[in-house]
C-alpha cells in the first residue's frame, strides 16, 4: 500500500525559521525611520542601475550574430591565412607581358596560314573537345578539358592571331573546369602536365593574365596528388574528376620519361604562384632519379614509383625514355645553371650515348642513336622522337662552347634525321627507322618497316632545326624546315585541318588517319614559325621550352 503522507513546509512555523532571519528582523526594527529610508533608497538605486545595465547588454547581444564565437575563431584563422597568403604573394615572380608582331616574311605567313586552317577546322567541328578528327569532321575526347585550346593558345599568341587567341582565352576563363568537364577516367599524368599545365604556364608568362595562373593552380593542385608515393616519384595516371591517382593496370612501373618530365612545370608553378609545395615535389622526384645507379648516365625506361628501382634493360632516347634526358639539361638552365647535379647527370648521359648508342650507318655514313636491349645488346633502331637530341646537344654546347663534340654530334644527328624525311617519297619521316651498321652489306642505309611507316605530324626534327639555325646561323636548317613544311602541306593537309598519315612511303596513297594531334599546333607549327624568324624570339639564356614547346622563363636561381 502506497504511503500517502506528504511533507509540508510551513514558512510561518518558527521551528523552520532561520535564527539569522530573526536577528536581521530585530535589527531592522531597531533602526530609526530616517536610517531605514536611506537604506531603501540605496537598494532602489542599485536595483535601477542593475536593470539598466541588463537591458543595455541585452540590446547589444541582439546585434551579435549567433555564430559570434565561431566568427572570432574564424578571424584568427583568417589572420593566419592572410599572413600565409602575404608570404606567398611576396614569393611570386613578377610577369611582364610580351608583345609579338605579325609575320615578317613569306615563310612565316605560310605557317600562320596553316595554323589558321587547323584552328578554323577545330573551332568549327570540335570546339571545347580535346582534338579534331579531320576526316570524319567530328570531335574526340581524351581529358575533357579542351586540350587543343590550352595546348596551342601560346602559339596563337606568338603568331599574333588576336581573334583566335581571344576565343581561346574566353573558353579557358569560362569553361575550363576539371570538376564539371573532365572525363571520369584515368589518363596520363605526364601528358596532362606537359600539354595542359605547360600551356597554362606559358601563356601566363607571355600575357600576365591572372586567369591563366588561376587555372594552372587549380590543375596543379590535382596533379600534385600523384607525387604522394613512398619515393616521391609520381604515379602514371590521374582521374582529374575524382582527384585520384593510379599506376598502370598492366604494370606497377612508370615510364622513365613520365616521372622525369614533370619537373620544369611543377617548379615553374611554384615560382609564379609563390607556393613552394609544387617545387618541393619536383625536387624530391628529381633527387630520387639522380641518386639511382646508372650505366654511364644511361638508365632503363621503366622505374617503380613505389621503391624507386629500375626494371628491365631497355635503354632508349625514343619512346618512354626521351624527355627524361632532355629535362636534365633544361632543369639546369631553368634553375639559373646553379644546380650542378643536373648538368653533371646530363653530360654523363651524353658520354653514355657516345660510348654505347652512337653508331655509323652505311653506305651513306650517317650517325644515329640506337637503343640497348637488356643493357648490353645494341639495336640499330631509332625513333623519330630521338631527333630531339640534336637540338638538345646544340643547346648544351651553347653554354659550354669548349665542348665542341656536342655541336659536331648535333650536326651529324640533325643531318641523319633530315635524311629520314628526304629519303621517303612523301618527304616525311616514318615514326621509326632502322639503320644498317654493316659496311659490307649492300642494303639501304635507312629502312622502314610496315608497322612503322606512319607519320604523326611530330615536331622533334623541326625543334632541332630551330636550335641549329640560331646557334650556327646556317640557313641550310631553314631550307630543310621549309622542305618539310611543304611536304606537310602536300600530304597531310585536309579540307578541314591536318591529319596524321599511315604510309610515308607511298605518295599516291598515304592513307590519312582520322586524327589531328594537338602537338601539331602546339609544337610543330610553333617551331616552324620561330625557325623562319630573323631573330630568336626566345633567347636561350632567358627561356627554356618544355617538351611540348611551351616557353618558360629561365630563373636566376
Give, region by region, the residue ranges found by the protein language model.
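Glycan-recognition and catalytic cores of secretory/periplasmic carbohydrate-active enzymes
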Residues: 2-557
Amino acid at each position: 500500500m502506497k504511503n500517502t503522507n506528504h511533507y509540508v513546509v510551513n514558512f510561518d512555523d518558527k521551528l523552520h525559521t532561520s535564527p539569522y532571519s530573526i536577528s536581521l528582523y530585530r535589527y531592522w526594527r531597531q533602526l530609526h525611520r530616517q536610517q531605514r529610508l536611506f537604506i531603501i533608497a540605496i537598494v532602489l538605486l542599485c536595483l535601477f542601475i542593475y536593470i539598466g545595465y541588463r537591458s543595455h547588454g541585452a540590446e547589444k547581444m541582439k546585434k551579435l550574430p549567433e555564430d559570434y564565437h565561431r566568427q572570432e575563431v574564424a578571424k584568427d584563422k583568417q589572420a593566419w591565412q592572410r599572413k600565409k597568403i602575404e608570404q606567398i604573394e611576396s614569393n611570386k615572380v613578377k610577369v611582364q607581358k610580351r608583345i609579338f608582331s605579325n609575320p615578317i616574311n613569306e615563310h612565316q605567313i605560310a605557317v600562320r596560314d596553316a595554323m589558321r586552317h587547323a584552328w578554323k577546322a577545330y573551332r568549327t567541328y570540335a570546339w571545347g573537345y580535346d582534338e579534331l578528327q579531320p576526316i570524319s569532321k567530328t570531335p574526340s575526347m581524351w581529358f575533357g578539358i579542351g586540350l587543343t585550346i590550352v595546348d596551342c593558345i601560346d602559339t596563337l599568341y606568338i603568331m599574333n592571331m588576336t581573334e583566335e587567341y581571344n576565343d581561346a582565352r574566353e573558353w579557358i576563363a569560362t569553361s575550363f573546369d576539371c570538376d564539371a568537364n573532365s572525363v571520369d577516367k584515368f589518363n596520363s599524368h605526364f601528358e596532362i602536365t606537359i600539354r595542359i599545365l605547360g600551356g597554362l604556364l606559358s601563356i601566363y608568362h607571355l600575357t600576365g593574365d591572372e586567369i591563366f595562373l588561376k587555372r594552372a593552380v587549380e590543375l596543379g593542385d590535382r596533379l600534385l596528388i600523384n607525387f604522394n608515393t613512398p619515393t616521391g616519384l609520381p604515379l602514371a595516371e590521374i582521374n582529374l574528376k575524382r582527384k585520384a591517382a593510379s599506376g598502370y593496370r598492366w604494370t606497377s612501373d612508370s615510364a622513365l620519361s613520365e616521372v622525369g618530365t614533370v619537373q620544369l612545370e611543377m617548379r615553374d608553378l611554384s615560382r609564379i604562384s609563390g607556393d613552394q609545395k609544387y617545387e618541393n615535389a619536383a625536387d624530391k622526384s628529381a633527387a630520387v632519379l639522380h641518386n639511382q645507379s646508372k650505366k654511364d648516365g644511361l638508365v632503363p625506361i621503366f622505374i617503380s614509383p613505389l621503391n624507386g628501382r629500375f626494371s628491365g634493360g631497355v635503354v632508349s632516347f625514343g619512346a618512354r625514355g626521351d624527355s627524361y634526358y632532355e629535362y636534365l639539361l633544361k632543369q639546369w638552365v631553368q634553375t639559373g645553371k646553379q644546380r650542378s647535379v643536373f648538368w653533371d647527370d646530363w653530360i654523363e648521359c651524353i658520354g653514355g650515348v657516345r660510348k654505347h648508342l652512337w653508331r655509323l650507318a652505311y653506305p651513306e655514313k650517317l650517325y644515329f642513336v640506337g637503343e640497348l636491349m637488356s643493357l648490353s645488346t645494341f639495336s640499330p633502331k631509332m625513333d623519330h622522337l630521338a631527333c630531339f637530341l640534336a637540338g638538345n646537344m646544340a643547346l648544351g654546347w651553347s653554354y659550354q662552347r669548349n665542348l665542341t663534340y656536342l655541336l659536331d654530334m648535333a650536326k651529324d644527328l640533325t643531318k641523319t634525321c633530315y635524311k629520314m624525311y628526304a629519303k621517303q617519297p612523301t618527304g616525311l619521316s616514318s615514326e621509326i627507322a632502322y639503320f644498317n651498321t654493316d659496311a659490307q652489306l649492300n642494303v639501304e642505309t635507312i629502312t622502314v618497316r610496315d608497322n612503322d611507316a606512319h607519320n604523326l605530324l611530330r615536331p622533334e626534327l623541326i625543334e632541332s632545326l630551330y636550335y641549329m639555325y640560331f646557334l650556327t646561323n646556317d640557313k641550310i636548317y631553314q631550307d630543310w624546315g621549309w622542305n618539310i613544311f611543304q611536304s606537310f602541306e602536300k600530304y597531310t593537309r585536309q579540307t578541314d585541318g591536318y591529319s596524321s598519315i599511315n604510309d610515308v612511303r607511298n605518295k599516291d596513297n598515304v592513307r590519312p588517319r582520322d586524327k589531328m594531334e594537338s602537338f601539331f599546333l602546339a609544337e610543330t607549327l610553333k617551331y616552324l614559325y620561330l625557325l623562319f624568324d630573323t631573330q630568336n624570339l626566345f633567347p636561350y639564356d632567358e627561356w627554356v621550352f618544355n617538351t611540348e614547346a611551351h616557353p618558360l622563363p629561365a630563373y636566376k636561381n
